[in-house]
């Protein structure tokens, strides 16, 4: 199993599948279509049925039941794309067998070193086989580790028919990293009662709480005149943006928050005297606090409009996704089965809120309750990203055990 994980994963990460927020096509990049087509062929080779890829790049497949019991249809999902935060082109995965727990020089020429001082969890992987970058790209373990694990788990179940299971549906979605993964996902066609995203991090991760999320785009309009004669005439749009930001609580930003704490996050700010644009995201686990944050932004805008004129600021605010907990609680048994599966494999479940979102956040509100499970990756979205193959193997075992337990309890 370990060799299959390494072979598939290292092959998959070499395909550039970064999504593109500026694109309006679905999927947003051609690499995702290329990858999807490859997976369609490999799913067929493994022996899955009903293998499809639609024109928008959504891949679906079925592992038929091998039991006469009436078992709920369960699904496993991962996403095709990788993050936009750092380049994912020409990924050169580096395999480190029997890792000694010490610093790894990823790139001598560029002096890129993965150190325990910077990443304290690193020594805990001593003895593992880990896969790193070469220091020039991200790795793409988010989410090609999860995708690989699903492929290997399906292959394992087909070759071990003594493990009884109900019908299993598999799906690989595009554009998750830019929040569009479920936008064109056909829940009815997928046909599962519930599902699990394989899109978590270190060993034991089991997540079923996510942020409530919104975006706020602000356009500040100024009046430009010659600075020598600007008194009582100039209105500086960039300074309006700065004035707006100063009215948000300084300590309620990502760099000062953790756990269940929400935040405002200024993603980008650019402009000049004539016009300036600021793009924020708003996050909170508590729905009331989430609404209060959005109202705070609206109030600041209203007060500044009264001061500078209604045309001085334009606000566009949109909800992105909601805390999946509300939709998971009524079917709590899907979390319990995953929890029990981990415990039976001597994995200590690490239940914590997702300080972000997964496809499951949106899918849960589309009628497909979908918690999230670990994949074995660390330091996602950058050159220090790595994955433990040993933990990937554990994730495969969890998928298999979840399928077995649903059949056993039917």
Curated annotation (Swiss-Prot):
GO cellular component, one term: cytosol
NCBIfam families tied to this protein: peptidase-T, PRK05469.1, PRK13381.1
Active site residues of this protein: 81, 176 (proton acceptor)
Organism name: Bacillus mycoides (strain KBAB4) (Bacillus weihenstephanensis)
Cofactor(s) listed: Zn(2+)
Residues binding Zn(2+) 2: 142, 177, 381
PANTHER family, per the entry: PEPTIDASE T (PTHR42994:SF1)
UniProt feature coiled coil, ranges: none
An example molecular function term from Gene Ontology annotations: zinc ion binding
The protein's role, per its UniProt record: Cleaves the N-terminal amino acid of tripeptides.
Family that this chain belongs to: Belongs to the peptidase M20B family.
Name of the protein this chain belongs to: Peptidase T
A UniProt-annotated Pfam family: M20_dimer
Taxonomy, superkingdom: Bacteria
Alphabetized UniProt keyword annotations: Aminopeptidase, Cytoplasm, Hydrolase, Metal-binding, Metalloprotease, Protease, Zinc
EC number: 3.4.11.4
GO biological process terms, semicolon-separated: peptide catabolic process; proteolysis
Localization of this protein: Cytoplasm
UniProt binding sites for Zn(2+) 1: 79, 142, 199
Predominant location category: cytoplasm
Cofactor, how bound (note): Binds 2 Zn(2+) ions per subunit.
Catalytic activity: Release of the N-terminal residue from a tripeptide
């Amino acid at each position: 199993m370990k060799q299959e994980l390494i072979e598939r994963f290292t092959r998959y990460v070499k395909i550039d599948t970064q999504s593109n927020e500026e694109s309006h096509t679905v999927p947003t990049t051609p690499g995702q279509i290329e990858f999807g087509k490859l997976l369609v062929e490999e799913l067929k080779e493994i022996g899955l049925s009903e293998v499809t890829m639609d024109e928008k790049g959504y891949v679906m497949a079925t592992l038929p039941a091998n039991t006469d019991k009436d078992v709920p249809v369960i699904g496993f999902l991962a996403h095709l794309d990788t993050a936009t935060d750092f380049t994912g082109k020409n990924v050169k995965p580096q395999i480190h067998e029997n890792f000694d727990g010490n610093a790894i020089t990823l790139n001598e020429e560029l002096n890129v070193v993965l150190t325990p001082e910077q990443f304290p969890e690193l020594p805990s992987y001593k003895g593992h086989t880990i896969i790193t970058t070469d220091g020039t790209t991200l790795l793409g373990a988010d989410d090609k580790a999860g995708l690989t694990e699903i492929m290997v788990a399906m292959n394992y179940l087909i070759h071990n028919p003594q493990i009884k299971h109900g019908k299993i549906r598999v799906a690989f979605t595009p554009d998750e990293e830019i929040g569009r993964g479920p936008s064109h996902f056909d829940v009815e066609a997928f046909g599962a009662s519930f599902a699990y995203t394989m899109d978590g991090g270190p060993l034991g991760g089991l997540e079923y709480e996510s942020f409530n999320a919104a975006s706020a785009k602000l356009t500040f309009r100024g009046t430009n005149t010659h600075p020598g004669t600007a008194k009582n005439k100039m209105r500086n749009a960039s300074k309006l943006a700065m004035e707006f930001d100063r009215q948000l609580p300084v300590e309620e930003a990502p760099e000062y928050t953790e756990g269940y704490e929400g935040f405002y996050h200024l993603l980008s700010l650019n402009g000049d005297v004539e016009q300036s644009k600021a793009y924020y995201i708003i996050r909170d686990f508590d729905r009331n606090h989430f609404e209060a944050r959005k109202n705070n932004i609206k109030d600041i805008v209203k007060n500044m409009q009264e001061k500078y004129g209604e045309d001085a600021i334009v606000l566009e605010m949109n909800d992105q996704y909601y805390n999946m907990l509300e939709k998971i609680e009524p079917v709590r048994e899907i979390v319990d089965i995953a929890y029990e599966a981990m415990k039976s494999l001597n994995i200590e479940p690490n239940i914590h809120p997702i300080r972000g979102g997964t496809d499951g956040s949106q899918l849960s509100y589309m009628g497909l309750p979908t918690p999230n499970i670990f994949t074995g990756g660390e330091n996602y979205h950058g050159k220090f990203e790595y994955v433990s193959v040993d933990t990937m193997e554990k994730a495969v075992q969890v998928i298999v055990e979840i399928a077995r337990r649903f059949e056993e309890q039917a």
